[in-house]
Regions:
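Short, charge-rich amphipathic segments
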Residues: 11-29, 48-56, 80-95, 113-129, ...
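Secondary-structure boundary/capping motif
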Residues: 53-57, 61-63, 92-95, 195, ...
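A structure-centric signal for secondary-structure junctions around beta-strands
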Residues: 59-61, 99, 160
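Conserved SGNH/GDSL esterase-like catalytic core that processes O-acyl groups on lipids
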Residues: 63-65, 71-147, 295-299
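Alpha-helical cap/lid subdomain in secreted, periplasmic
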Residues: 117-249, 281-287, 292-312, 324-328
Length: 329
């Protein structure tokens, strides 16, 4: 009995040592792999920076400017254009049916202070149609709430009023998450003061969960991979879509001078005109089903035009270009 017990005990100990040994080997391999991935990230940095710098020379009907750090550079993706900035640029192009010039001012490793110092002076040279800001993750390691808020205020005060600014992403580590919570409170409060739209990046990355985030991360376990950047882009998409629609409305319903004079109100005025135009089109369609009389009365109410009586003989050919007196193009 004793011998059987001793054999069982030895088997258990050897088995446990085997598990511990395997775990240690796995841990060493994991650390080694993470270090190798970190080195690959270092090698990526100049490649991504050069790629975006070359893209700045491209022409486009719309201008998209990005402020940020290595995530805006797309570090960790299989190609620079597969980062969230590249994905958003592609979405803007598809939604607007216009070509897009991307000026990516982001700098890998940048903090809020670095963005204020290095990126804001360059931003002054551009008048972007779309602007995104995602900065602050690199502040967390040595987090100072007062300095963070001063830098965020400087950045948010310098970007266009239509800029979309992002929360810091979920980091899942309790100590870091406590700092992130303070940082995101500042992001929301200052963005609200400046009237900026906040992309819910923390909310969305937290919803994904730690397990999926692990598989959505590059080998360094810090930067997203292609799947991770799709998650990041999804946090910006609703606000970017709304901005693209507003730009389209401004270009359709306002002259350049009118848009300049209206300033921050240009989007609201253009969207109101677009909504009025849509409502008017629906009303005209409804009136058309009731006959020509209701159509003319409604057109007069909408445009202030007066219908010209039709005095042609029945045999006259119809006018190829009918119009109303006072109708605007």
């Amino acid at each position: 009995m004793r011998s059987r017990t001793l054999i069982a005990l030895l088997t258990s100990v050897v088995g446990s040592l085997g598990v511990v040994g395997a775990a240690a080997v796995g841990a060493r391999a994991g650390v080694k792999g993470q270090r190798a991935a970190a080195q690959r990230v270092v090698d990526m940095l100049p490649i991504h920076a050069d790629w975006w710098r070359e893209r700045q020379q491209h022409e486009g009907q719309l201008l998209y400017v990005a402020i940020g750090d290595s995530a805006a550079q797309g570090v960790g993706a299989t190609a620079p254009g597969r980062g969230y900035v590249g994905l958003l640029a592609r979405r803007i192009r598809h939604r607007s049916h216009m070509s897009v010039r991307v000026v990516n001012l982001s700098v890998s490793g940048s903090t809020t202070w670095g963005a204020k110092r290095d990126q804001l002076p360059k931003l002054r040279h551009y008048a972007p149609d779309v602007c995104t800001v995602s900065i602050g993750a690199n502040d967390i390691a040595d987090f100072d709430p007062d300095k963070f808020e001063r830098n965020i205020r400087a950045i948010y005060g310098a970007v266009p009023s239509h800029a979309v600014v992002a929360e810091l992403p979920c980091m899942f580590v309790p100590d870091r998450e406590r700092k992130v919570a303070v940082a995101n409170e500042i992001v929301h409060r200052v963005a609200d003061e400046f009237g900026l739209t906040v992309a819910p990046l923390h909310t969305i990355t937290k919803r994904v969960g730690v397990r999926r985030t692990f598989f959505n991360s590059y080998g360094d376990l810090f930067h997203p991979n292609d799947r991770g950047y799709e998650v990041w882009a999804s946090a910006f998409e609703p606000a970017v879509d709304a901005r693209v629609d507003t730009v389209a409305a401004i270009r359709h319903y306002l002259s350049v001078r009118e848009a300049e004079n209206l300033g921050r109100e240009a989007g609201a005025v253009a969207n109101a005109r677009a909504e009025q135009d849509t409502d008017g089109a629906e009303a005209l369609d409804h009136a058309a089903r009731q006959g020509p009389g209701p159509v003319e009365r409604l057109r007069h109410r909408m445009t202030g035009s007066i219908a010209v009586p039709d005095e042609r003989d029945q045999s006259d050919e119809p006018d190829d270009h009918p119009g109303d007196v006072g109708r605007t193009a």
